[in-house]
């Protein structure tokens, strides 16, 4: 056989930031237009503060983007805004801003929800074999 490799591949988890989300529904006449206006409002207010910022219109463009839904009209649509940041408080702001659309956004918004999720990243690295010491511990519940 071959000699053991000097390095071993190790997957390392690390704290990779936060994702803040907010959702709100619009229904009835001009639901799509109101949802798009709400998305524009949030994007203008906070969009530039994030590493990643996404606006989806669930029921209209959340799966295939807007290329396949252009010109279509929907009686109801759910606005979803998600953004990623290294700062937890900033990520939490996304949901707060969407929730504020109840009183400070287009008429008829309902069912607002907000979420905050920690992002755990994974990266593979090579470590010297002599730095790795296997250890097994069994916990009983």
Predicted features along the sequence, with ranges:
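C-terminal non-catalytic interaction/assembly regions of soluble proteins
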Residues: 1-141
């Amino acid at each position: 056989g071959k000699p053991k490799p000097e390095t071993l591949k190790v997957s390392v988890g690390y704290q990779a930031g936060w994702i803040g989300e907010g959702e709100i529904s619009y229904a009835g006449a001009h639901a799509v237009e109101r949802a798009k206006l709400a998305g524009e409002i949030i994007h203008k207010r906070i969009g530039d503060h994030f590493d990643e910022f996404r606006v989806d219109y669930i029921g209209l463009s959340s799966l295939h983007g807007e290329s396949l839904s252009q010109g279509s009209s929907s009686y109801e649509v759910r606005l979803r805004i998600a953004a990623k940041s290294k700062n937890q408080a900033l990520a939490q702001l996304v949901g707060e801003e969407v929730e504020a659309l109840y009183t400070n956004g287009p008429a008829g918004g309902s069912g607002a929800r907000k979420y905050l999720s920690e992002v755990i990243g994974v990266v593979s690295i090579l470590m010297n074999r002599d730095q790795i010491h296997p250890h097994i511990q069994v916990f009983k519940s």
